[in-house]
Amino acid sequence: MKAKRFVLEKYFEGMPKESDLKLVEEELPEITDGEFLVEAVYLSVDPYMRAYVSGLKLGQTMIGCQVAKILQSKNSSYPVGRYVSGQFGWTTHFISNGKAQDITNYPPFLIPEDNNVPLSLFLGILGRPGNSAYFGLLDICNPQPGETVVVTGAGGAVGYHVGQIAKIKGCTVVGITGSDEKGAWLKRLGFDHVINYKTEDISLALDKAVPEGIDCYFDNVGGEISSCVIQRMNKYGRIAVCGSISMYNATAENYPTARMIQPFLVTNELYMKGFIVGRTYLNRWMEAIDQNTKWYKEGKLQNQETVTEGFEHMPKAFIGIMSGDNWGKAIIKP
């Protein structure tokens, strides 16, 4: 069995380039006891990969999750014909032993056979992004009916999901995104207010949208935008820090700066917690998938994907999400 995979050719400097990744082909060995062979059906590109890549060695397979079909198996827990979601990397075929394979510490799990939902959802609203939205918002922010929730990166795979859960919980939702087109889409999803950070003054826009302050903040970007939000939070507000995409491509010359937030954390007794969903919530993984599935089937949770056809286009799709080109979840169909 031949496998194609993208390996790290050069460490990223600033915005990733297609030449930083190299497409190689190799012959896979026969599987041994305890192993199973999968073929990718859908692959994912996500912003966290930009931050994690520094932990790879040159020549290693680029990290990433995929939904794959089991073609061969000598592991009774992973039978032939079943579909699995796993952190197998940017590769068309992979041999797994059922354990966590890379620095994300995310083991493969079998996709339920009776879910009757599109397989690609297990990379989005029923996968790592969906679980990040679920646990980050509900466990850390704990929004209550009538409260105000602000989410940055609102047009991305995690952000648009956070906003929808907040609406399910009876909250007023403000999404911050980078285009008027995405803003209009978010309004159609039910967001109460949308701010275009590229064209609007964030401080003025927040004061207008939420004059009574902010109770919960789901932070996907960091930087000065987060400072603006945190300065407007109410007493005992809660902050879930999921990502910091504003600095992922930064270099020493253009590292983002932001106003101090410590006085506001102290004065308003704010609760702020960063989290890595695959580490903190692995023992509750299916809880989020089950609930998100229920909301999806009830029509309360909408799915949005930007699909790229062709395995060879993975680097281009990855660069696209770092530029905010995607709406919702970015998916590659090989």
Feature roles, as predicted:
Residues A3, K300-V307, P315-P334:
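C-terminal capping/lid region of NAD(P)-dependent oxidoreductase domains
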Residues E27-V45, M49-H93:
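Glycine-rich beta-strand-centered segment in the early N-terminal region that forms part
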Residues C65-K69, V80-G153:
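NAD(P)H dinucleotide-binding glycine-rich loop of Rossmann-like/cofactor-binding domains
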Residues S85, V150, I195, D215-F218:
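N-terminal Rossmann-like NAD(P) cofactor-binding module of classical short-chain dehydrogenase/reductase
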Residues L123-E200:
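Mid-domain Rossmann-like dinucleotide-binding core that forms the NAD(H)/NADP(H) cofactor-binding site
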Residues P143, V210, M233-N234:
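A generic alpha-to-beta junction signature in SAM-dependent methyltransferases
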Residues D201-E212:
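Short amphipathic alpha-helix with an adjacent loop that forms part of the alpha/beta core around
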Residues E224-K300, K333-P334:
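Glycine-rich phosphate-binding loop and adjacent beta-alpha segment
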